């Protein structure tokens, strides 16, 4: 993402600005305009926001522009599979989120996903995006027990700043359940 946006590594970004700039650059790229590569804006926006929800739920604060990439194949341009995904809120040095939504959508570890969906209404219908996020949120129910079954250390599972113990309550507060 940093290379596409021509930004220096480590610079703080705002999600909505990044999304719009990426959409513009990709839609106006030679690959799309001249070669006819397919780029689904709604699918991209949905996946971007869904990945941020997953980062938040799993305590992965390391969401800088080098941890997101694109690939192109015969079906078009899309995000690569998720990589470099770990509960970085557990890092003793404290890894802050470098890409944020900004207030009033994100403040003090709380998120207003309804407002996030409205912010992106020029790219996707807010109801559609919120519905897709609700589906992802439902899949996060029971995450704590599934992670324990897979052997995630208790030190991570119980660390308050990672926040795995109260995911359903947070999802309800954020309007996703």
Tell me what each language-model feature is:
Residues 1-65, 69-177:
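Anionic ligand-binding catalytic core segments
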């Amino acid at each position: 993402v940093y290379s596409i946006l021509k930004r220096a590594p480590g610079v703080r970004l705002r999600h909505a600005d990044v999304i719009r700039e990426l959409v513009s650059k990709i839609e106006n790229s030679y690959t799309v305009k001249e070669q006819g590569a397919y780029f689904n804006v709604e699918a991209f926006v949905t996946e971007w926001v869904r990945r941020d929800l997953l980062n938040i739920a799993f305590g992965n604060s390391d969401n800088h522009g080098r941890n997101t990439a694109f690939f192109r194949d015969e079906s078009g341009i899309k995000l690569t599979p998720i990589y470099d995904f770990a509960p970085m809120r557990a890092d003793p040095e404290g890894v802050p989120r470098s890409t944020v939504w900004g207030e009033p959508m994100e403040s003090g570890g709380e998120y207003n996903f309804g407002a996030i969906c409205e912010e992106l209404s020029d790219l996707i219908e807010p109801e559609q995006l919120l519905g897709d996020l609700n589906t992802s949120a439902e899949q996060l129910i029971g995450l704590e027990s599934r992670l324990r079954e897979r052997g995630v250390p208790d030190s991570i599972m119980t660390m308050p700043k990672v926040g795995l113990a109260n995911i359903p309550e947070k999802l309800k507060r954020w309007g996703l359940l």
